[in-house]
């Protein structure tokens, strides 16, 4: 029944009827046939514009590649012109298909001739499968004129627009036609982008560089950040915090604080080595004043090199004064027998006091020291050692002459007292020996008291008006002398002498020079005074 049904269906379609017909084999079954061949073509898509009345061309290339070109009908082209608004010459004349071919093994084709009613069977040679290609892209620039670009631009704007409207740059391009092959190439790329959803032209195309007046159409989301181009100088550069010369104020201020701290440290360290001249309270007070001056100076002055140079000069000045003081005042330290020559200490302390206002003025005015140049330090403060030593020798010679006159009177009184006591004690030897011992002790105590009183009187006469802290320091030095009468010139602080131990070998040659000066000035050398005292003591012993 199936066969009958199929025959009926086939007979109805071919209008053959129920009669029996002869089946013939075609020329393809003949092995000597080389002129006739039958092939089948399978299309993936066949447009309605294909003209069936015209012949198509099949091109078989190497490696079984086949290209089929099918012409389009004129009616289809006219319909396309009406829909898309294109001109007559802008239509696509044909459709191109490309694919590959494969040989058949056992496939046949039946051909029915309606005129004769004969049925012929032919053998199939190849099966060709092709797909539609966009070969009109390559052929289109040759045939498209420039005036067709504005309409395509409008269409392209509708394809690329997000809301279906033509963007403003596209509308501007649609107003003016483009000339030359560039417009044709532009149109071809637009056709491609309408299908693939890509940008309408490359960003770095040569056309964009040659015509800077044309606006650049870029389709991107509004949330994306603008790309920074290093070659474009007009764009805003990234904001980077720049360090200028004004920002150096903080660094210089910090360095300035360090310099002031070094000044205060060096000055307080040098002042701590002289407790007899400057008290600890006054040094701390001066340190605070220097810090206050340093803070004020940070606002007015920004020059750091003078600050760096000041501590070195200040440290060099104070050891120079220390050498002068040690050379003038410590010449009698190795001899403890010169206890009675304590008035020598008076002019040297006065000389210390004369020099002390200069040092205090230097410490209380660091701002003035910074304003001076390095050369002014040597001319104003660092006096030559020869001038200092000559002045000290003159002052010492005058003071020793006065002290020698006082001692001569005391020695004369002591000798007369000893002679009278020896005559009175000759009657009673036992009681005389005891009284001599007591009188000698009393005389030594009286002499010490008289010397202290004379020192106080000389202090009051020679001393100039001094600041409050200097008076306080002088009272401390007097109390120190009263408490330690047997030290003589050793009342200078041990810390100060230990601070300058390398200067102690100098007093011995200075002592020899000073003894010669004392003798030439009419005073008594130290050796003669000691011999007189020993003779007086020996005479008292002989009388006993």
Curated annotation (Swiss-Prot):
The keyword Nucleus applies. GO terms for molecular function: transcription elongation factor activity. The modification Phosphoserine is found at residue 205. Residues 147-544 are annotated as: Disordered. Belongs to the EAF family. Promotes transcriptional elongation by Su(Tpl)/ELL. Essential for development. This is Ell-associated factor Eaf. It comes from Drosophila persimilis (Fruit fly).
